[in-house]
Amino acid sequence: MKYLLLALLLCLAVGTAGGFKIVKTCEKDPRGYIADLGNGKYLMHLEGSPYEMGYQHGCLKGAEVQSMTKEFVKSVLAGYDIPEDLIPGLLKLGKEVAKGNEKYVPSEFREEMRGIADGARDAGYDVDYDDVLLLNMGFDVILSIAYPIATPIVAWQDKKGVACDGFVAMDDATSDGRVLMGRSFMFNPEVFHEVALLIEQYPDRGHRFVSVSAPGFVGVTAAMSSAGIAIGMDMVPAMDTKPFVSGMGCLLTARQVVQYADELSDAVNMVKGSKRGVPWLYIVGDGKGREKGGAVLEVSADKFAVRYMDYRYPEWAESLDFPKQIEDKDDLVVVANHYIVPEMYSTISYAVKDSLWRYETLTGLILDSYGSIDVEKGKELIDYLHPPNYGYYGEDENVPVAATRTLFDLSNLELWSLYGMYTDPWAHWELTTEYQPAGLDKAWKDTEGDVAGPSWKPINYGAPIIDKEKMLDSADLQKLSEADGNYVEQCVKAYAGNPNYATIHLRFNVQSSANIMLTVADQNDGLEIYAWNYNTNDWQKVYDRIYPSGFTTLRLSLGSEFVNNRKADLVLISEAKWKFGMIYDKACVAVDAAAVT
């Protein structure tokens, strides 16, 4: 039996032509990376199983996760004038409440949190699972303690400007009929504004999605999926709260929606069926499904109502001293921080003056722009409080954004988000359509990376060792890194050990084109390499020859026809059928990114 040894060395197209550059990868799992979007804005890309995505997250942003779990959580409490000596006790109570509600959190999200903690800890930072759990459930934990006494929370909200706004507009409301959703997440800016970024996730189950977030969050505050679903949430003070019961929390509920909802009705049913202890308002948009549009979900611990775009305020409630609905269009819905549906407001809820003012102002501005809302107008509308602060609007811009302003184009899967400082530019990202590889039937199925069967042995690669054909030691790598600011290290994960076929499937993160370098070692066997051609929708043979015994370096230049959604796929087939295949265990490459287009 002949054996095939492959060292798989990846040279990524990470220049600026595609609008971003990969600047960091997770050494132990390089599918996770940080991309520089320019202007000081970054995106973190994660993919794989829940634990794998979590580990990549902690590995890449361990310092920031530590800041969020330690300093941000403390700053939230300190921001409400809680004496400093009481904060440690409240944090301890918060962790106990979170732990008591952990059973409501899906196991996959718990695994992702464990991955974050492990990745951050392996990177040398003081983060444990309970820290990450509290960060992700903290909003609901705090409110499950505070809302039952209601009045102080209302005073805090009115004083501190803890508030959010949102809208969904489509059809006649927008300039070309597209579905636009605005989401203003207004919260304590401490720490958050310094570490905020976009997080793009390719989970092994469900839809891919991108969120405007901060390191440490498994849950989402504003996110959009490849199915065209977007979601955000607003606080709403109400007495229908279960003390010390947070359920899975609003952030994780929103994460479940954005990852698994195919259309608006799925989102509604997921929120309705979730375990809740605290009232919230969820705004959901759908730009791709059969139920294209938007809705506001008004929920409390035990009650639930949906305000779709065609909702009309009932006549019987007109005489009541309840907040009234202003928008009366079938292609528009707006939300602030109070219930509109009378049956929900009657649960002893509170509409603070600031929320009423924001709802009236934003709705009025949207109606004034009705029919002409495009991307630029949508950004202007959701950032109408530029900048917000208690007691004034629109004066000093040299302040942190508290915390994000985001516009989603749900028809075209694009987002624009303002975070950091008000003087910063908006970050932009396009979430491409669902990636569905295909081809080479049996060979593909036997080598499909992340769904490998029990006969497969996963191989995790180590340190970079090869640049072109030169063997490099650590000193060489250090020199290369210092000499060239475009230097990157990138690895690839694959699977070996298939007893039926000497085949390996590789999926590369690339831009519009890529140079792939493979170092192979074998005993006079033939090797065929196929790449998926998106122009012909078929596999195209890009290499076929018998190579001599020993190490041979192959270079493949893949044009744009082999790249889709920043992915390129290769299948390698050897003449040798192996029983115990092996892959060379150090399969990374040090490359000059500027030389790759």
From Swiss-Prot:
It comes from the Archaea. Its main location: membrane. The chain crosses the membrane at residues 4-23, 209-231. Pfam families: AAT. Keywords: Cell membrane, Membrane, Transmembrane, Transmembrane helix. It is found in: Cell membrane. It is a multi-pass membrane protein. InterPro entries: C45_proenzyme-like, DCD1A/B-like, Peptidase_C45_hydrolase. One of its GO terms (cellular component) is plasma membrane. This is Uncharacterized protein AF_0267.
